[in-house]
Amino acid sequence: MNKCIYVVEDNPNIREIIEFLLVEEFYEVKACQNSKAFWREMNVQLPDMVILDIVLPDGNGIDICTALKENVKTRRIPVMMMSANNYLNTVKAKCAAEDFINKPFDLNDFAQRVAQFLAN
């Protein structure tokens, strides 16, 4: 069974590129454009990994990450935070995500990071 990754990204172009890349790597991908869609999917199935944009139209990835890490059922799910802004050090202080990546990012590096988290 393929590993399942939830991608939460409001920019449709970036979301589609990430989804395409991950599907090519044989992952099952649930792409969400906002936090409401993400939480709806979480009620259906827990993923093996979550990739979160920090700025979303109806909330932010930091709050989602915090909620995931505080919940016994979801705290072990690896979270990668993405941002187009260079304030990831500030985000690291507020959020217990396993990884942080700046946009734009190298697709090969991104794919390798995802593979490392899902190899365990």
Specify the residue positions occupied by each region the protein language model found.
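Acidic catalytic/metal-coordinating carboxylates
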Residues: N34, N60-D63
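Hydrophobic/aromatic residues positioned on beta-strands within the core alpha/beta folds
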Residues: M80-M82
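Acidic, metal-coordinating helix/loop segments flanking the phosphotransfer/catalytic sites
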Residues: A31-M49
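Two-component/phosphorelay signaling modules centered on CheY-like receiver
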Residues: P12-K30, F117
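The feature encodes the CheY-like receiver
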Residues: P57, R75, K103
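Alpha4 helix (beta4-alpha4-beta5 surface) of REC/receiver domains from two-component response regulators
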Residues: D63, N85-N102, N108, Q112-A115
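Active-site residues of response regulator receiver
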Residues: D53
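Conserved acidic carboxylate
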Residues: E9
